[in-house]
């Protein structure tokens, strides 16, 4: 089984932005999300984007006026972010997101951990560790935004085959196997090169996180949960340090 980093290096990074619907579409959605929820600088104007990928959160945050530290394990996705960000105030760091304190500014107004990044952690204990560490690092009235997939209900039989995205030259599908605490995600990517289809395949584990448990972790750490929503299988929470 590949680690998260190996899975992205070997397969996912090369097609990630396309797989997610396209870079500009994701930027548009997150710009609207941050605007709709009044996410703009009010104090130190510093943000840390955990699992930043190619910049779906970091770029809109920087456009809104934040100085952003973007952390991800994928060198290729960070390179894509740097290329797209131009002169925006974004600093990229290649590291495990649990090590964010080693790279963060002294004052932090907002953390984002979106795009299903939270499920990439290995254990519930790591999730709790991250939430408590973020709480300690945030300045007063600081915000944490979580966005992750609800995988508590098991898909069965053929429903475990997910057609993610396809076009005339690329096809991305995945197959899910459920374990007690994790889901094994088997990704299969076909790409047409010189009139021949080439296949890449890899799998890794995602952590199954219930929305209620995640909310309880936030409250236990000291956060006030200001938004709690489930839409199209994605759980979104906005929590504020009290």
What does each of the following model-derived ranges do?
Residues 1-53:
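Conserved class I S-adenosyl-L-methionine
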Residues 55-100:
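Class I SAM-dependent methyltransferase SAM/SAH-binding core
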Residues 102-110:
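A short acidic, Gly/Pro-enriched loop at the edge of an enzyme's catalytic core
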Residues 109-125:
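A short SAM/SAH-binding and catalytic strip from SAM-dependent methyltransferases
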Residues 125, 145-213:
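SAM-dependent methyltransferase
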Residues 128-140:
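A short glycine-rich, Lys/Arg-flanked "PGG" loop and its adjoining helix->strand segment in the class I
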Residues 213-242:
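C-terminal lobe and adjacent flexible extensions of AdoMet/dcAdoMet transferase-like proteins
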């Amino acid at each position: 089984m590949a680690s998260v980093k190996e899975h992205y290096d070997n397969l996912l990074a090369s097609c990630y932005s396309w797989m997610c619907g396209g870079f500009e579409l994701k930027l548009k959605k997150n710009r609207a999300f941050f605007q709709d929820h009044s996410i703009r600088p009010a104090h130190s104007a510093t943000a840390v984007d955990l699992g930043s990928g190619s910049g779906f959160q970091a770029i809109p945050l920087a456009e809104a006026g934040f100085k952003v530290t973007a952390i991800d394990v994928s060198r290729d996705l960070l390179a894509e972010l740097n290329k797209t960000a131009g002169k925006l105030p974004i600093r990229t760091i290649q590291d495990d997101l649990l090590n964010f304190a080693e790279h963060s500014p002294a004052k932090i107004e907002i953390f984002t951990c979106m795009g299903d990044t939270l499920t990439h952690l290995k254990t519930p204990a790591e999730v709790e560790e991250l939430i408590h560490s973020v709480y300690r690092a945030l300045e007063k009235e600081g915000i944490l935004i979580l966005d992750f997939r609800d995988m508590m209900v098991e898909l069965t039989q053929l429903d475990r085959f997910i057609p993610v995205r396809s076009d005339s030259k690329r096809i991305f599908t995945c197959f899910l196997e459920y374990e007690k605490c994790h889901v094994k995600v088997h990704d299969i990517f076909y790409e047409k090169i010189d009139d021949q289809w080439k296949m890449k395949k890899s799998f890794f584990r995602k952590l199954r996180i219930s929305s209620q448990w995640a909310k309880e972790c936030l409250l236990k750490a000291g956060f006030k949960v200001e938004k709690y929503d489930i839409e199209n299988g994605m759980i979104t929470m906005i929590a504020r340090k009290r």
